[in-house]
Amino acid sequence: MFTRYKIIRSFRELKQLVEACLNTGYASVDFETNAEGIYKDTFKPTILSVSFQVGSGCSIPLQHFDESVKEIPWLKWLQYFGRRVVENPNIVKVAQNFKFDNQIFVKYGIYVRGTVID
């Protein structure tokens, strides 16, 4: 199977990703972190990986060494995605160990609505 994977490097691409999730009604999400405890001051979500269909996916660099490619701070990117996708009850969220990912969303003021398949 051919797999397409993209690193989101501009706000325009982030908007396109959100549109794709809205169009399919699905978003598979998974955070990568710096492995610090979530409640430590040193905790950092580094990447949010998202897929909206089989065979494709995107990585959104957050507090990652590649952050310099973005014109908008990482938290604004996360909140933009979160408000439109994670908080959208019409989009089915798919995850593995969502209780961890959800803790990160909540830490940054994003509250899941709708169906979650874990």
Predicted segments with their positions:
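Conserved RNase H-like, two-metal-ion catalytic cores of nucleic-acid enzymes
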Residues: 1-118
